[in-house]
Amino acid sequence: MAKPLPKISSRRNGRIGSRKNSRKIPKGVIHVQASFNNTIVTITDVRGRVISWSSAGTCGFRGTRRGTPFAAQTAAGNAIRTVVDQGMQRAEVMIKGPGLGRDAALRAIRRSGILLSFVRDVTPMPHNGCRPPKKRRV
């Protein structure tokens, strides 16, 4: 009977070190999505691959407190802390949405020491596209 050949490389033993810490990212893009209910901060490299992300919900805020500026500031600080350790020095900021956390997240990003090349508002605005939902009657 033939002996089974051992697997040369499987998915489990293929990686020796942690993949997250192996990359040094000098430049990236910080996306801030600020809705009225939550603020999500995603940090990607220039090609668009996600490096780090955080939201007000993952920082422990629940309910209406997720939409506050302080929650947005905490979420931005959490997301940025990991990429500063990986060596990010320059970034572009894309802010989307009408929420209260827009300015607070931007202040937290400025305070982190990352040099911002530009800040762009990418809030989607319809050119009279879809009909909006009917007004609430309370």
Swiss-Prot record:
Gene3D superfamilies: Ribosomal protein S11 (3.30.420.80). Keywords: Chloroplast, Plastid, Ribonucleoprotein, Ribosomal protein, RNA-binding, rRNA-binding. The keyword Iron does not apply. Signal peptide: none annotated. It comes from the Eukaryota. Coiled coil: none annotated. One of its GO terms (biological process) is translation. GO terms for molecular function: rRNA binding; structural constituent of ribosome. Residues 1-24 are annotated as: Disordered. It is found in: Plastid, Chloroplast. Pfam families: Ribosomal_S11. Residues 9-24 have a biased composition (Basic residues). One of its GO terms (cellular component) is ribonucleoprotein complex. Part of the 30S ribosomal subunit. Belongs to the universal ribosomal protein uS11 family. This is Small ribosomal subunit protein uS11c. It comes from Manihot esculenta. The lineage of its organism: Eukaryota, Viridiplantae, Streptophyta, Embryophyta, Tracheophyta.
